[in-house]
Structure formats: C-alpha cells, structure tokens
C-alpha cells in the first residue's frame, strides 16, 4: 500500500507544501544531482505532483516524467496541475501519470534515470520493499532520491511557550509521541521519522555514492503573522483541530498510542494537556506574543544504482 488510509485525505496536501522549498536551494540540488542531464524521471507516490512539478524545469529539455500514485484522485489533480504549469510538454506527451502501488510497480526494470519520492516511505508498512522497487526501475548508474522527515524531532521542537512548561510535562510529551510513533510502526502505518534510517537503507539495498542533505526551509511564526507563508503554516493546525483529523483524531491517536505500549490513563492525560497547550497557543497568537523559529528536519538522501 502506498499510503495508510487515514493519511489519504486532502488535509495532508495543504497550501503549506507550496512553501516547502526555496527556489535557490532547488537550483543547488539540481546542480548537485546533474538534473540537466536527466532524460527520464519517475515520482513515486506523487500525490498532487508538488515535488516533481518543482524538479521538472531542471531536467533536460526533452525529458519525460512519470508520476505514480495509488489514488486516482491524486493522479487526476496532479495531471491538471502539470497541464496548468507546463502545457506544452504535457501536450507533447512528455508528462504522464499512472495508478500503481509503490511496492509493486507496473513498470519495467532499468527504465528511469532518476526515481524519486517525497514523504512516501514514511507511510509504507514495508518501506524497504518500496525502496527496492524504486531501485529496480532505475537505470544502472541512475539515481534514487528520497525526501523524508524526522517527525519525532519535529513534534518536539520548541517555541516561545516552551519555557512556561515544566520539565515533567516536556518529558511526558516526548514519551507520548514516541509511543505514538512506535504504535504506528507496529500497526503497519509507517515510520514518521524514517528519514533517520534512509542512509542505512540505501547502503543495505546496494546503492553507492550516498549523499545526505537537509532541506533548508523553516516555517517561522512571529507577530503580526501577516504574510501568506505564516497563514499557510497556521492553517493546518486550525483545520485539523476543528475537523478532528490528523493529530486531533482521538480514535486514531488512541490506536497508535496504545499499540506503542501507552496506557489509557496517560492517553487521556496527554490529550487534555494537548488541548490546554493549544488554547495557550491561540491566546498567545491573539495577543501577539507567540513566536517560533519553525525548524523541521527533512532529509534528502540520494544514491546511485551500480
């Protein structure tokens, strides 16, 4: 399965993704990866095509691109976004999309110069199987490029309200999210911090010339919270809470937390703490005294197929 069912809603493709990458950093990556020489690229688990749409201008002029996702809805929307952005290559048949499972790709071996994914492996029950499929369809001497987060770190990043929290509360918060993460893994929903494991997985799979980079983007928040990027950063938190989705989906969080060895008592205590923290954040935002540097660990790992 390319993505767990709970992670398939449009809530996971919000406007904040439009701010994930700085243009000058993308140009640097394109130079490092020699994308100007790439004549074929496959984006596995492409979703709405955010990632491959950014890479496409850096490929060779006649390059062909294939986006693959398990969900037909995402493929249709990705095709439309490419048609809007690059109508001439799309009309010329240089861009195509295919519905397929990331762990069983309906593609011949040794087909693409570059095979890439963004936040795909973190959702797979068997991420190594997904990586092996990516390698299989990569040409010899081609590149595999994966973009994946370390979300346990990201969940624990500090902000201007952290000094108000006592040490015990912060320790319990770490335990809560650690058990949540381990429960997800135990239930086959994926490892949300898989970025930390990618270099070892690449080596185990036989890739060479392995390189690891960090995304250079942060999502700072500071008064008066007026620019579009800050609005896009705040919007998912509000939307998840009002719709009881994502980290505010109590039933889902309960399943993961208990599967990670947590107790029902601790779950209710921590969920209550989360609500209190959310209320404090809203008050601080309304009073113009909330700020955060907005750092997030996202790894870009590339390797070459022998």
PLM-predicted stretches and their roles:
Residues 128-143:
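A short glycine-rich, Lys/Arg-flanked "PGG" loop and its adjoining helix->strand segment in the class I
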Residues 19-39, 54:
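Conserved alpha-helix/loop element of class I SAM-dependent methyltransferases that forms part
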Residues 150-247:
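Conserved catalytic/acceptor-binding region of the Class I
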Residues 146-148:
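Acidic carboxylate diad motif detector
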Residues 113-128:
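A short SAM/SAH-binding and catalytic strip from SAM-dependent methyltransferases
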Residues 2-12, 213-293:
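C-terminal helical/coil "lid" or tail adjacent to the Rossmann-like core of SAM-dependent
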Residues 103-115:
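A short acidic, Gly/Pro-enriched loop at the edge of an enzyme's catalytic core
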Residues 40-44, 48-104:
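Class I SAM-dependent methyltransferase SAM/SAH-binding core
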């Amino acid at each position: 399965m390319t993505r767990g069912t709970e992670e398939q809603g449009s809530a996971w493709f919000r406007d904040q993704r439009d701010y994930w990458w700085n243009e000058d950093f993308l140009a640097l990556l394109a130079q490092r990866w020699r994308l100007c020489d790439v004549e074929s690229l496959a984006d596995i688990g492409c979703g709405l095509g955010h990632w491959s749409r950014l890479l496409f201008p850096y490929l060779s002029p006649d390059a062909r691109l294939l986006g693959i996702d398990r969900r037909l809805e995402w493929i249709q929307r990705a095709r439309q976004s490419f048609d809007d952005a690059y109508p001439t290559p799309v009309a010329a048949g240089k861009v195509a999309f295919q519905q397929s499972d990331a762990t069983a790709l309906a593609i011949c071996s040794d087909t693409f110069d570059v095979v890439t994914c963004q936040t795909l492996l973190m959702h797979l029950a068997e991420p190594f199987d997904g990586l092996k499929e990516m390698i299989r369809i990569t040409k010899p001497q081609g590149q595999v490029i994966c973009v994946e987060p370390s979300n346990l770190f990201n969940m624990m990043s500090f902000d201007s309200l952290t000094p108000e929290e006592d040490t015990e509360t912060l320790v319990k918060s770490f335990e809560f999210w650690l058990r949540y993460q381990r429960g997800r893994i135990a239930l086959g929903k994926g490892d949300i911090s898989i970025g930390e494991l990618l270099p070892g997985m690449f080596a185990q799979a036989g890739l060479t010339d392995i390189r690891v980079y960090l995304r250079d983007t942060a999502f700072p928040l500071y008064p008066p919270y007026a620019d579009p990027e800050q609005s896009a950063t705040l919007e998912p938190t509000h939307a998840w809470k009002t719709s009881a989705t994502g980290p505010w989906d109590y039933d889902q969080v309960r399943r993961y937390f208990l599967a990670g060895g947590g107790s029902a008592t601790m779950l209710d205590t921590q969920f209550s703490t989360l609500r209190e923290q959310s209320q404090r954040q809203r008050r601080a935002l309304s009073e113009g005294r909330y700020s955060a540097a907005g750092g997030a660990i996202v790894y870009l790992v590339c390797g070459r197929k022998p």
